[in-house]
Amino acid sequence: MPVQGSLRSLVGAVNSTPTASPHLRPATNQTEPQCLEVSVPVGLFLCLGLVSLVENTLVVAVIAKNRNLHSPMYCFICCLALSDLLVSVSNVLKTAVLLLLEAGALAAQATVVQQLGNVINMLICSSMVSSLCFLGAIAMDRYISIFYALRYHSIVTLARARRAIAAVWVASILSSILFFTYYDRTAALLCLVVFFLAMLVLMAVLYVHMLTQACQHAQGIARLHKRQHPVQQGWGLKGAATLAVLLGVFFLCWGPLFLHLTLIAVCPQHPTCNCIVKNFKLFLALIICNAIVDPLIYAFRSQELRKTLKEVLLFSW
């Protein structure tokens, strides 16, 4: 099956510089049906990366500054921000290098460029894997805090959290090396897809279980205070909306990229599959959008973190 170069497309982030041509353009040839290819302008791509870079840098700086935020939960959030930060940095760096090379402003030997590209490729792949892992870790941490509240501090200790974080980083680096080495194997692509599906199922099961438990708890309190059903229903709708945002953002931002990999592995020669695969840069831009949204969902909802963020911003002025 001709999958050579497919994983390089994943870890290579932008194998060619996004053009500033019209955002929607039909891609046609004599053998393929008309396709709708979405072009991401290079300026927009770089802006998204820079916004994510600034946002996640602030999260890491705030958590590092405030000792009250050095709990296991915030350690996982900090590592998620660091992973998203690396995703943004590596993609912005690769795009900038490609632009400089095309403009002739950067002169380097082919071997040096190749080695630099390999390093950036591995950084992109490892940061994506670690980002998915820490999203799962945050879901598990919240699950334990709800269902094992009395034993939470004995189960999720800072030492265990640090060991788990170290294991995630080591596993991410090793997996990126393996994926990059065996990029021409269909199995490598399918492993990535299975890993994404496993994280999606894990998060869905944990958050749905947490929502049902919270709804039951709210109903119990309502009965105790003899409240009416609209209050219970309103709380349930709020919880369902939160769950929809958590899983919806995860699926919408990460799903297209892994659909891209699945189609490359399953139907690389099919015209319809080829039409979808051509939108790789759009899928990559969605990953960077996820890196922008993650701090809003997981970090900035904390009152303590927002308070420290204000102090950091005021001090910087």
UniProtKB/Swiss-Prot annotation:
Disulfide bonds: none annotated. Belongs to the G-protein coupled receptor 1 family. The chain crosses the membrane at residues 38-63, 73-93, 119-140, 164-183, 192-211, 241-266, 280-300. It is a multi-pass membrane protein. It is found in: Cell membrane. This is Melanocyte-stimulating hormone receptor. GO terms for biological process: adenylate cyclase-activating G protein-coupled receptor signaling pathway. Its main location: membrane. GO terms for cellular component: plasma membrane.
